[in-house]
């Protein structure tokens, strides 16, 4: 029985990155032998065990065989005679198909180290085409390693395009798409995930509402960066730069889907794109089976983001309407993710990548002022039922009116 470190631990060590977790492949063992040695079985689809002391995952070397369309259509074979090279051959990218033995000797049958040095994301074998999830994983790794200069190898992109044309991504279940999309959105350069998916043709199949934004013109005065798709990509990276939550990043991805619905005669302005985009944001969220918090914030940011950008010009009653629309008085934890998404939207424009956004500070202060209003005092005055609600709202409006407002600066009307 021989153990080998594999995959991300080997790759990240060679890149000089921190190694967060170590996975192992075991050659020449059986499940019975692993359990006899104290390993705890945890794998459902194939033999995976946890080390009795370290808790690190140890998988028996295995091969895979395609049996049907989609990522579920695989048959696995794990046995003592399966070699390390056979196990590595089933992996997606060459940089993930390296191993080290117990002495630290590198085992690299597919040129992963060369591709690391050349900053290439390249498939190991044409078996890559058997699993459409690998297109999503490729895009996710492109987002992770973009700052290191990694690019997708031409032949790998061509293979992905053929997979999409063959309908492979159409067989992906929503939960798997969401899992990879969510992980990609949390990478340092999430725009690269969307760019790779778009180049492969997969974005149009998985997120047609986002794909439709590319080529949609915007007002040059507000969006010198170009079309609505480019703005969305820039906003995603701006969200990553402020360490926004997954909920906020997903909301940024969808916040402008209404711009693809703007009538041609209105272009390049997009009046009413917030309301127009609500159904699209809700549809994407439900199709992907995104978590409720992600779904809710995506819809709310889509609907209300222009109110946030115009906050310094809004009447106090409209500011309170914004807070009510976000349901902040019952869900105050929504404020920061909402503001992060709107900040990213503001910075996702040419020349504003590091700009201040005074509207955010004003909205925080205004909401705190509103929270200082208590219904109890009005009840003690003898008000009842709807009278209490009306009095509370009026008091909140007065509180907002007392909050100092910095200079509004350049408006974003219709942006």
Curated annotation (Swiss-Prot):
The keyword Nucleotide-binding applies. PANTHER family: MULTIFUNCTIONAL CCA PROTEIN. Monomer. Can also form homodimers and oligomers. Belongs to the tRNA nucleotidyltransferase/poly(A) polymerase family. Bacterial CCA-adding enzyme type 1 subfamily. Its EC number is 2.7.7.72, 3.1.3.-, 3.1.4.-. One of its GO terms (molecular function) is ATP binding. This is Multifunctional CCA protein. Keywords: ATP-binding, Hydrolase, Magnesium, Metal-binding, Multifunctional enzyme, Nickel, Nucleotide-binding, Nucleotidyltransferase, RNA repair, RNA-binding, Transferase, tRNA processing. It comes from Halorhodospira halophila (strain DSM 244 / SL1). Residues 228-329 form the HD domain.
């Amino acid at each position: 029985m021989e153990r080998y470190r594999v995959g991300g631990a080997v790759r990240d060590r060679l890149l000089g990155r921190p190694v967060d977790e170590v996975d192992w492949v075991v050659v020449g063992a059986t499940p019975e032998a692993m359990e006899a040695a104290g390993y705890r079985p945890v794998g459902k689809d194939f033999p995976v065990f946890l080390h009795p002391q370290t808790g690190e995952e140890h998988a028996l070397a295995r091969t895979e065989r395609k049996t049907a369309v989609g990522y579920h259509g695989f048959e696995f074979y794990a046995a003592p005679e399966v070699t390390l090279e056979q196990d590595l051959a089933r992996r997606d990218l060459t940089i993930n198909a390296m191993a080290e033995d117990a002495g630290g000797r590198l085992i690299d049958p597919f040129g992963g180290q060369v591709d690391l040095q050349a900053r290439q994301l390249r498939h190991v074998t044409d078996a890559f085409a058997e699993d459409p999830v690998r297109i999503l994983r490729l895009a996710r790794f492109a987002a992770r390693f973009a700052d290191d200069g990694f690019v997708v190898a031409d032949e790998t992109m061509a293979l992905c395009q053929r997979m999409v044309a063959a309908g492979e991504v159409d067989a992906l279940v929503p939960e798997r798409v969401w899992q990879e999309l969510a992980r990609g959105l949390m990478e340092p350069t999430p725009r690269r995930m969307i760019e790779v998916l778009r180049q492969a043709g997969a974005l149009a199949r998985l997120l047609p509402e986002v794909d439709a934004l590319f080529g949609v013109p915007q007002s040059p005065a507000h969006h010198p960066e170009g079309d609505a798709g480019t703005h969305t990509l820039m906003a995603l990276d701006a969200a990553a730069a402020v360490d926004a939550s997954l909920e906020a990043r997903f909301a940024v991805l969808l916040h402008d889907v209404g711009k693809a619905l703007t009538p041609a005669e209105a272009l390049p302005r997009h009046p009413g794109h917030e309301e127009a985009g609500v159904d699209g944001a809700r549809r994407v969220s439900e199709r992907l089976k995104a978590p409720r918090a992600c779904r809710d914030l995506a819809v709310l940011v889509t609907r209300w983001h222009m109110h946030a950008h115009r906050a310094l010009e809004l009447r106090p009653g409209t500011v309170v309407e914004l807070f009510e629309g976000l349901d902040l008085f019952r869900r105050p934890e929504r404020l920061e993710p909402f503001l992060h998404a709107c900040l990213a939207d503001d910075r996702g424009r040419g020349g504003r990548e590091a700009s201040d956004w005074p509207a955010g500070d004003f909205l925080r202060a205004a909401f705190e002022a509103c929270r200082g209003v208590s219904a109890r005092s009005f009840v003690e005055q003898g008000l009842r039922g709807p009278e209490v609600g009306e009095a509370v709202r009026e008091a909140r409006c007065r509180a907002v009116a007392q909050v100092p407002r910095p200079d509004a600066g350049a408006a974003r009307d219709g942006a």
